[in-house]
Amino acid sequence: MDTTLSKASPVEYELDLHATADELEPKLKEALNAQRKNMDVQGFRKGKVPLGLVKKMHGEAIGYRVAEQFVQEAFEEEVEETDAIEPLGQPTLVDLDYELDADLQATLRFGVRPGVELEDLSSVEITMLDPEITEEDVEDEIERLRKEEADLLPLEEEAAEDTDYVNIDLQRIDPDTDTPIIGDKDEDLTFFLDDDRLKEELREALVGQKAGDTFRVELPQEHPAHEHAGHGHPHEHEGDGEDRLYEVTVNDVKRRDLPPLDEEFVRRVTEGELDDLEAFRNDIRERLQEAWNERAREMAQGEVIDKMLELHPVPVPESVIEGYLDSFVKQVEEENDGELPEDFDEEHFRQRNRRDAEDQGRWMLIRDQIVEEQDLEVSNEEIQTFFAEQSGGEEQVTAQQIEQFYQTMPQMMEKVEQQILSDKVYDFLFDRLDVESKSREEFEEEMQQQQQQQAQRQRMAP
């Protein structure tokens, strides 16, 4: 067997391979014999079919499989088992010239890790949200919890207000005949009138109505409520751009009866952990602060990645890009019960998501370079801390039980280690970047300006 390794691009190599028919013959004969053991041909005992007949019937397909396997083994021997080159992603067979009982000529292309020279980051600015929890934040959260615990009391005579719950039936009406359209009716729909996803036309029509009222209203031809109502409209109509006429029957109106803010309420929402109002407020403040800190870090991490990609435009091997695109397609499958949707255009999907795949591949290369240069590692103590945080100190599920669950799935354990490693990379970058802290008000104003600028650029784009 003759092999030649050549550089095809700054991040790709090609392995050219030539093998004679004599070199392939032992593997081909072995594959033919394996096929013969399972063959059941009339006139011959099972497993006793002449090898020549096996070859005549299946030789071409078997030969191709043998050739592919031979090329893969050559790649492992010539590339993977040496320290000269570190391949990235899966190799691609770009050429295979082979006929049964003839020589084999093949070319494999594979990606390699490019050199990444990290730039000086001391003058690179990023914005970090510095969230300060106010008393208003605490009171808003308490009010939210009270609303969650509230009882819904039916109103007999009072009209619906914009913070009430209304249950209705919707019957579409034919405007030409002024009669109900049979089969076009939705029943038992419940809406919270202060839900910003609710169609404004329906909200305005329902405010002021009472249980037992019936009225008509024109609504947009799409579902007249909102997509998260819990009931999808069962009928599809040809879109004509016109509103549709509905008769609305109000079944009931309910209003929230907020529980008093007392020790009993505190015990209920904390499941008995607290019973003191002041301690309850302090606990809420700490939880809000923790949640906002986490959100601030996540937003800053996104900005860090954008800055690092901008500063380090390293080339990404095609095999790495394709690997990420494969994972995107796999995610679509998992979101659809293990199958791609019937109308899924994979080629268009891959083209549309190619930039994201390339960016993820580039960030992976930059991140790995930081890990190598800084000798970042994940200790067993850090893994144990992760599981302890996941358990949250709960008695029902201990850190040890969570760890045992993860250990049954090596891929999950690998994700845990990579998550911890990524946190260390971000810590390293935050220490070296010029981080400017901003209040929530300043941060939201800046984000709004950026969104407006982005929208303006999109409008000006050809």
From Swiss-Prot:
<dbReference type="GO" id="GO:0003755">
    <property type="term" value="F:peptidyl-prolyl cis-trans isomerase activity"/>
</dbReference>
<keyword id="KW-0413">Isomerase</keyword>
<keyword id="KW-0131">Cell cycle</keyword>
<keyword id="KW-0697">Rotamase</keyword>
<dbReference type="GO" id="GO:0015031">
    <property type="term" value="P:protein transport"/>
</dbReference>
<protein>
    <recommendedName>
        <fullName>Trigger factor</fullName>
        <ecNumber>5.2.1.8</ecNumber>
    </recommendedName>
</protein>
<dbReference type="Pfam" id="PF05697">
    <property type="entry name" value="Trigger_N"/>
</dbReference>
<dbReference type="InterPro" id="IPR008881">
    <property type="entry name" value="Trigger_fac_ribosome-bd_bac"/>
</dbReference>
<dbReference type="GO" id="GO:0006457">
    <property type="term" value="P:protein folding"/>
</dbReference>
<comment type="function">
    <text>Involved in protein export. Acts as a chaperone by maintaining the newly synthesized protein in an open conformation. Functions as a peptidyl-prolyl cis-trans isomerase.</text>
</comment>
<keyword id="KW-0143">Chaperone</keyword>
<feature type="domain" description="PPIase FKBP-type">
    <location>
        <begin position="163"/>
        <end position="259"/>
    </location>
</feature>
<keyword id="KW-0132">Cell division</keyword>
<feature type="compositionally biased region" description="Low complexity">
    <location>
        <begin position="448"/>
        <end position="462"/>
    </location>
</feature>
<dbReference type="GO" id="GO:0051301">
    <property type="term" value="P:cell division"/>
</dbReference>
<dbReference type="GO" id="GO:0005737">
    <property type="term" value="C:cytoplasm"/>
</dbReference>
<feature type="region of interest" description="Disordered">
    <location>
        <begin position="439"/>
        <end position="462"/>
    </location>
</feature>
<dbReference type="InterPro" id="IPR027304">
    <property type="entry name" value="Trigger_fact/SurA_dom_sf"/>
</dbReference>
<comment type="similarity">
    <text>Belongs to the FKBP-type PPIase family. Tig subfamily.</text>
</comment>
<dbReference type="Pfam" id="PF05698">
    <property type="entry name" value="Trigger_C"/>
</dbReference>
<dbReference type="InterPro" id="IPR037041">
    <property type="entry name" value="Trigger_fac_C_sf"/>
</dbReference>
<keyword id="KW-0963">Cytoplasm</keyword>
<dbReference type="InterPro" id="IPR036611">
    <property type="entry name" value="Trigger_fac_ribosome-bd_sf"/>
</dbReference>
<dbReference type="InterPro" id="IPR046357">
    <property type="entry name" value="PPIase_dom_sf"/>
</dbReference>
<dbReference type="InterPro" id="IPR005215">
    <property type="entry name" value="Trig_fac"/>
</dbReference>
<dbReference type="InterPro" id="IPR008880">
    <property type="entry name" value="Trigger_fac_C"/>
</dbReference>
